[in-house]
Amino acid sequence: MEPRAADGCFLGDVGFWVERTPVHEAAQRGESLQLQQLIESGACVNQVTVDSITPLHAASLQGQARCVQLLLAAGAQVDARNIDGSTPLCDACASGSIECVKLLLSYGAKVNPPLYTASPLHEACMSGSSECVRLLIDVGANLEAHDCHFGTPLHVACAREHLDCVKVLLNAGANVNAAKLHETALHHAAKVKNVDLIEMLIEFGGNIYARDNRGKKPSDYTWSSSAPAKCFEYYEKTPLTLSQLCRVNLRKATGVRGLEKIAKLNIPPRLIDYLSYN
């Protein structure tokens, strides 16, 4: 039997499976006037395609903020799941649209939906939007959310070499030595051969001796005499200073939102800058 739209689909209801509707098309393309006309004529804003994509998913993935606003105002389900489990907030983060992310959050989108795959924070790290990453953390995103494919958001940001996102995560208290199959963010940094990333992770307490499920240290993924290899060699011969180790341990003690706590300490501004990695 051919999938068909539900008879009498009301705004706020999820319809039967259909192919992409005019509402999907208008939402994806950012045709806000056409979308508004469709909504006013009674078109269902929660109709799902065979892969469970709603018009709100389509608009969010393309960063069409005006269309997202129209759909939400018309009763679109803010936490609808597609076939992969992703919500519109995941898609908005994947697009890197801070405006869409703000709209969805204002309508109550869950920042930590129960997922085994990429969370909104993972998607923001994947897209490289440090602004989205910062906003999600501010509203309570789980820094250690685990994706069965990628690991933590920090793993994703390092694998994609998004240094701004990495620093936001680390400053917010992300576990620098979190592991997926014993593989840490430092292993990813070594694999992508990014010296700046390697140095940042080590400065935040990354364990250069951690071994993955193949028994390899991060340095084992570098070429002899290459810049990354020399970087690891330097830190093996020159461990972090006492002041650096104190900073790492104090940051661990402050935990999530550590920067906010450090800024309120009754200590000289120079020390606050040092503890904040400025």
From Swiss-Prot:
Residues 229-278 form the SOCS box domain. One of its GO terms (cellular component) is cytosol. Keywords: ANK repeat, Repeat, Ubl conjugation pathway. SMART domains: ANK, SOCS_box. Pathway: Protein modification; protein ubiquitination. InterPro entries: Ankyrin-SOCS_box_domain, Ankyrin_rpt, Ankyrin_rpt-contain_sf, ASB13_SOCS, SOCS_box, SOCS_box-like_dom_sf. ANK repeats lie at residues 18-47, 51-80, 84-113, 116-145, 149-178, 181-210. Pfam families: Ank, Ank_2, SOCS_box. Coiled coil: none annotated. Belongs to the ankyrin SOCS box (ASB) family. May be a substrate-recognition component of a SCF-like ECS (Elongin-Cullin-SOCS-box protein) E3 ubiquitin-protein ligase complex which mediates the ubiquitination and subsequent proteasomal degradation of target proteins. The SOCS box domain mediates the interaction with the Elongin BC complex, an adapter module in different E3 ubiquitin-protein ligase complexes. This is Ankyrin repeat and SOCS box protein 13. It comes from Homo sapiens.
